[in-house]
């Protein structure tokens, strides 16, 4: 999906065609993108789509996170409450997490609307990370950014999206002893840098 709102729309289509409860995973910074189709499509007062939202909780109160996540983190649970979306915390024990997802699926079916499970910092950090992309691409993101810097005219304005691309552009400029005057390092608004 292009963004979280698209994911909710795709999930609704999945439900309409299979009668199975879909799960949409998103970071809480994507909740704003998801809310329009949640309240105007999936809501129990519209098309009653039982939907499980698994939401990564960046900026959770009491945790140390980047500034762009703090406000969203502080209001994540409040936004779900305002939209009358029941929610519970994710568990970092596999058996408990399976039970939590089963709870969410049952409740989504019963209430015929969205239910959320919020995953705080570190909940999914216990296992070994594996890359599904390892070896598929001959060039790293940093190498691609450096080629772009080498190729485009000196006064080109660069807009870098949130996350690693922003950091890599910043540190490449530092390493190359170049200024940042033509760089917009977008640390928030995930998925909207090209707008």
Where are these regions (language model features)?
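Thiamine diphosphate
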Residues: 1-194
């Amino acid at each position: 999906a292009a963004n979280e709102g698209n994911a909710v729309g795709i999930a609704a289509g999945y439900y309409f065609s299979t009668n199975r409860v879909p799960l949409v995973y998103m970071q809480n910074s994507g909740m704003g993108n998801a809310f329009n189709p949640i309240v105007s499509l999936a809501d129990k007062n519209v098309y009653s789509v039982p939907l499980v939202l698994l939401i990564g909780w960046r900026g959770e109160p009491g945790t140390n996170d980047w500034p762009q996540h703090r406000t969203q983190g502080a209001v994540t649970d409040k936004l779900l409450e305002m939209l009358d979306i029941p929610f519970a915390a994710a568990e970092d024990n596999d058996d408990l997490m399976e039970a939590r997802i089963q709870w969410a699926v049952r409740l989504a079916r019963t209430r015929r609307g969205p239910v959320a499970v919020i995953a705080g910092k570190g909940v999914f950090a216990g296992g070994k990370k594996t890359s599904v992309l390892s070896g598929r691409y001959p060039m790293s993101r940093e190498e691609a950014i450096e080629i772009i810097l080498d190729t485009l005219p000196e006064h080109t304005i660069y807009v870098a999206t949130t996350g690693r691309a922003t950091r890599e552009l910043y540190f490449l400029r530092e390493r190359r002893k170049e200024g940042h005057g033509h760089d917009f390092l977008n640390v928030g608004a995930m998925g909207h840098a090209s707008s």
